[in-house]
């Protein structure tokens, strides 16, 4: 059976923890150097020496990033293979219906060539991410400010550097794209993992559909679905009808963070995965009104609030780790994290959803 969207999301978070480790390593090394600079007298500040230390640290961070990128790619390729095999198994009965012998998975050349093309694309994407991760300039700006603050003696070192380090903790390690747009490394990794699996699944489904002569599609269905796709999920359409429908949607199926995919079917042969009553239950569940404090929202919207809370808790932990390693007070930050955790738990209980503290995990901190 195909891996569910929720399982894929969970796996993507797990793999992307490798890049969370890189982020933590970067923040810790930078914070420790800022702590050491703060112990120096202005007459003992040697900019070149500090730049050399910074350079060694950046080299170490980049080496660690390269290592974690390689390990992540191994995990991703294993996921691709597992997902592709499950997708291939699921359509064996459609080959049989057409009287076509389904080739062994490894002997289906078209499928293997497609998977290899996605593997190469993914490898290039992650290697480019590693090369374009913005570490050096961010680190240099922080060290420059630390040296200047000590050298001039005008401003309070702890206050100035505390603000700078908090900003760097929230920003984290960033990937810079050719367009100039930046994104946090961990977020970029998760996005690319999920997109890669989506490409694998859709490619296998499309190619097998061609091989056994599919004449329709079924749109996947899942609970807690966005309102704009609720009327269509779980439904079967002819190929032409689906193409017309999808081109009419402002947010087409399978794009813009949509977790839906389509299975290529033979109309009248492929059974519906969900009957109308089951789809209605999913719709009712997603649209159920939830009262959070003095505001009302749908259960689906509550899941979005939870995802944002998980992100905010990760950033807050990054602040605490950074301040702790810089030898600065972080009690207020820890208190705020406790309040964030309570609010997250409150939202989950109001919406009757399971808290996912694993999605707020940051290496080096016990939430």
Where are the model-predicted features located?
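Acidic, glycine-rich two-metal-ion catalytic cores of nucleic acid-processing enzymes
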Residues: 167, 175-176, 183-280
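Contiguous, non-catalytic segments that form substrate-binding/exosite surfaces or channel walls
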Residues: 122-212
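N-terminal leader/targeting and assembly helices and adjacent pre-domain segments
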Residues: 1-163, 276-367
